[in-house]
Design a protein with these regions (language model features):
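Well-ordered beta-sheet/strand-loop patches within structured domains
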Residues: 1-300
Length: 300
């Protein structure tokens, strides 16, 4: 039986397994030849060998492997102060871990598994991050921009997302409902290469602080496009906490924390084939908590 050429991914290396020609023998004809040889002095016969050709050849795979950009997405960040510069370094380190990763068909990508622990020993720095309802300095702060940027590229390539959680509070580098938070040992971002070909992830940071992920594979349906929209977010007003201070004159107020509203947003995915809508589905509901506004008021 003929065997088609195939492709495997081992230790992030792509291997093409060559095709094999199929060989078989017509049993009925062979039995007839054997009978004839038993009753004949002629001992030379041509065996009834049949050859079958594989449908997929090595050169076919080689010509299609990593030839198309399935999707790309970029976000930007600022490095104008120490905190943001630290964020930028964390973003650069995490994107380098992902750059060049190759996924076999059916393979699952785990952000935490690929990027690994975000530690000082690995070069990560302390920067602002969300933790337990507060903005705190955390080693690896900013890495969620990497996972969110990759999430957007993955969505546009129409790959299957199996684990994604939005941030506790809103973020400024992607639209509402389009972020993906991560925490090593906790929340992860995962997706599956649900195509029939290997996919290579390219990720880099440009000199002007733009983070880009590009997914390279084989586009077997160039007429398909994927779009996303949110019909509108429900605004959740931020709670206000007052701290009475007798040392301040009555009526005087001092805003200690500005606070921010929360949001609930539904995100939908539309798939078009040659410009015609073929499917529409709800992708996710993302809930962002409001940040408490804290005001000190004088009662003296």
């Amino acid at each position: 039986e003929a065997k088609d050429a195939s492709v495997t991914v081992v230790n992030n290396n792509v291997n093409i397994v060559p095709e094999q020609q199929g060989i078989s023998i017509d049993k009925a004809t062979l039995e007839q030849i054997i009978k004839e040889l038993q009753n004949s002095e002629d001992t030379v016969r041509q065996l009834p060998v049949q050859f079958t050709q594989p449908k997929v050849l090595s050169r076919d795979i080689q010509s299609k492997l990593f030839k198309d950009t399935l999707a790309s997405f970029s976000t930007v960040f600022d490095t104008s102060n120490e905190n943001n510069a630290n964020r930028g370094e964390n973003i650069r380190l995490a994107s380098q871990k992902i750059n060049g990763k190759i996924l076999a068909p059916g393979e699952t990508f785990s952000f935490n598994e690929v990027v690994g622990p975000r530690t000082v020993e690995s070069g990560y720095k302390a920067a602002h991050a969300y933790s337990n309802g507060e903005v705190v300095d955390e080693v690896g702060g900013g890495v969620c921009q990497v996972s969110s940027t990759l999430y957007n590229a993955v969505l546009r390539a129409d790959l299957k997302v199996t684990e994604r959680v939005n941030h506790m509070f809103t973020v400024g580098y992607v639209e509402l409902g389009m972020d993906a938070t991560v925490s090593y040992g906790g929340v992860d971002f995962k997706f599956v290469n649900n195509t029939e070909w290997p996919i290579k992830i390219e990720g880099w940071v440009s000199p002007d602080n733009q983070l880009t992920f590009r997914l390279i594979g084989t586009n077997t349906n160039p007429g398909k496009t994927v779009h996303f929209y949110s019909p509108g977010a429900t605004v959740i007003e931020c709670p206000v906490e007052y701290i009475d201070d007798p040392s301040l004159p009555s009526g005087q107020i001092d805003v200690l924390k500005e606070g921010a509203p929360g949001y609930s947003v539904d995100t939908y995915k539309i798939v078009k084939q040659d410009g015609v809508v073929v499917s529409e589905e709800k992708l996710s509901t993302s809930y962002y908590q409001p940040m408490k506004r804290v005001i000190r008021r004088g009662i003296g």
